[in-house]
Amino acid sequence: MLRLIALLLLLPAVLRAEVYLFDAPSGAVTDELVIYSTLDQRLAEPLIAGFQAENPGIAVRYEDLLTGDINARVTAETDAGGVTADFVFSSGMDLQVKLANDGYARPVRVPQAAGWPRWANWRDTAYAMTFEPAVLVYHKPSFPDGPPLTRIALLDYLTAAGDAMRGRIGTYDIERAAVGYLFLARDQEHFADIWSLVRAMGAANVQQFPTSQQILERVSDGRLTLGYNILGSYAADWARSHPDLGLVLLRDFTVVISRVALVPRAARRPDLGEAFLSFFMSRAGQTILAEKLRLPAVSLEVSGSNSAQAMQAALGPQLRPVAVSPGLLVYLDQAKRQRLITRWHRTLEGR
């Protein structure tokens, strides 16, 4: 049985956490696994159910937190000499790698690690678990002949459309949406004309939003006709129930990001954290991820359409996955971050 047991405001940091308890299926609790995660509890339920089916004596305490709050809690609890979560799963790739790089994660060599892609494993301390591309979403009725398929084509389309596209394209607010900032930073590395595209979006009065849902809602009902650099896993899920929403992986290149898992060094029960990681990386766990959570699986043992293997077979070098490595730490450099944000705003304003 699942119970919402608390809505915590954790002082002094004033971090907000929704805390859920998944009772042990056996009815006789022998252990409790503690998870900190950015994944919505509703999405996490099938994964936890699969783990508990194999481990019926284990209850799960699931704390739903923001990416920055997870980093702050693990750091603060470890530095205080106490214990922290047994397992951490976050969409904040850079912050997860920072925890591992700074010594807050323990090396875990689960059996599945031997077959894990090299880019998705950093020193057995941080593992990519999903494979999520950035996509262009579009309002199908507005594009009877199909949407732009490359960034150059998108630039040409916005330039030619002029005032007809004013206020009709959306993207993430890169100051409030970490994924939007990461996608822009990677675009800058792969696409020499990115700032020409940003200038064209600014001329079209691009609308900026902190969440994927706000963009997807507006594109699916036609208030927007395009959404740039949207997280593909959410877009694909939304498109299943909104037939007017289309999506395309731009053909010049497609940035792919991942949600990252680790077992903290100060875990209260590291053995339970390792057991959950092992299940998550197993064929069974990754199949649940792909089929029930609808998040593309990294494991090479999963070959269905919602997997890294299938996407790589179909798209090859078009895909540019972000490696789990200290290279991500550059995106946490505050001076560099501010320079990119300043350039973004100035370019949107046509300066």
Where are these regions (language model features)?
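Mature extracytoplasmic/periplasmic domains
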Residues: 264-324
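Periplasmic-binding protein-like
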Residues: 118, 131-133, 197-202, 208, ...
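A ligand-binding cleft/hinge motif common to bilobed small-molecule-binding domains
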Residues: 94-98, 220, 224-244
